[in-house]
Amino acid sequence: MICRKEEKYGIVLSGRVNFETVVPLRDFVNNLPADAKELTIDLSDCLSMDSTCMGVLSMLALTGIKSKLKMRLLNAGGNRQLLKGLGVEKLFKFEDGEFIPYETIIYPAGKTAKDMKSAAETVLEAHETLISADNSNQQRFGAVVEMTRQDVERLKENK
């Protein structure tokens, strides 16, 4: 869920967050509202996240740093170790506490159709971000990036 109240935005990640469920978050990152001053990401109910989710969170952190966005990850728990393992923990400010979602819900606005091209583009962008954030991720994800890039091109041709 993505919500807002004036210039404050909140994101609640729940369950198992993966390449299929993180596309709206990538879209939010790529269209970060100019009025955003503060962002809270609540991971209290996030059971697990895959590398695509961690890459999209890293995209958000890097975008936030550039735009001087006050950003914090709440209640990361074991997910913090996952971020640390990929060398991107340094991008985040971690806190514990309660987050009460804001009243204006941006996402989900309704049911969205699964889009293979958007999912593939999300996987590609996320893993490219992980590699640029920490070069040691090249060895981990270089093949993923190359295969996904080919998938994206194939999906574009089939349109």
Predicted regions and their residues:
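Histidine-anchored nucleotide/phosphate-binding helix
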Residues: 55-61
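Generic recognition of short, well-ordered alpha-helical segments
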Residues: 23-24, 52-55
